[in-house]
Design a protein with these regions (language model features):
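Acidic, glycine/proline-rich low-complexity segments that act as flexible tails and inter-domain linkers
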Residues: 34-143, 158, 162
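N-terminal cationic leader/targeting segments used for protein routing and processing
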Residues: 4, 25, 29-30, 36, ...
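A glycine-rich phosphate/pyrophosphate-binding beta-strand-loop-alpha-helix module
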Residues: 96, 145-199
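Short, Lys/Arg-enriched N-terminal segments with co-localized hydrophobic residues
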Residues: 11-32
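Acidic, glycine-rich active-site loops and adjacent beta-strand->loop/helix elements
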Residues: 136-141, 166-172, 211
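Phosphate/diphosphate-binding glycine-rich loops and adjacent basic-rich segments that engage nucleotide
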Residues: 193-226
Length: 226
């Protein structure tokens, strides 16, 4: 079975810095820069008609099936349509599977990550430049133990402030929230409570449903794809 649909959910935190690295690579090599200046804004996406939405999603899916990489702008628009509930489950599953089968490009991954950042509910730590973000390895198919949670605990104990992103398990035996819940950790904290844990205990758990509410539109498909 093709393991599709998890890359843009379980690796988004890693992608935050990925765009920076790609930009540096393009500058060093003299390559053309991708940007979102021609992509639709969230307000424009919300104003699209059903016919316009269908046309955009159909073109993107046809390209992915033909193994043609989507541009940064095109992937951004597709991701906004997914995250605002304007892409039905059947088309979303087909899109994610087609992207996985052709192998996602740098611009596709970074565009998806950018949209997740745009729609995220954030916390504002006092010294964000001294903050470490550890995200899980869910969806990798390796069936590992919960490496990211163990790493977060070790780093926090060593004095590093860690913002640990995580969710319930999809592909493995236990996701980060499953492990922490069994240990008695309260997951449904307010943003202020999470920030207090981060500042006072060096570790704040950013439970995905609390900080990425737009992901509710993609979760049923994610679970179905495995």
């Amino acid at each position: 079975m093709v393991k599709a649909g998890c890359w843009f959910i379980d690796t988004f935190a890693l992608c935050y810095s990925y765009r920076y690295l790609v930009t540096k690579h393009q500058q060093q090599k003299g390559l053309p820069m991708q940007n979102s200046q021609h992509a639709l804004t969230l307000a424009q996406i919300n104003a699209l008609t059903e016919e316009q939405i269908d046309k955009k999603l159909r073109l993107a899916l046809d390209n992915a099936i033909d193994r043609i990489d989507l541009t940064y702008e095109q992937m951004r628009e597709v991701m906004l349509l997914i995250m605002t509930g304007k892409c039905n489950d059947a088309r979303m599953g087909a899109m994610l599977t087609a992207l996985r089968m052709k192998s996602e490009s740098i611009d596709e991954i970074t565009a998806a990550a950018a949209v997740m950042r745009e729609l995220a509910e954030r916390i504002e730590p006092a010294n964000p430049e001294r903050l470490v973000d550890i995200v899980g390895t869910g969806g990798d198919g390796a069936n590992l133990f919960n490496v990211s949670t163990a790493s977060a605990l070790v780093a926090a104990t060593a004095g590093v402030k860690v913002a640990k992103h995580g969710n319930r398990s999809v592909s493995g035996k236990s996701g980060s929230s499953d492990v922490l819940a069994q240990a008695g950790v309260k997951l449904d904290l307010s943003h202020d409570e999470t920030l207090a844990c981060l500042e006072q205990q060096n570790l704040g758990f950013l439970f995905a449903p609390n900080h990425h509410p737009a992901m509710r539109h993609a979760m049923p498909v994610r679970r179905a794809l495995g």
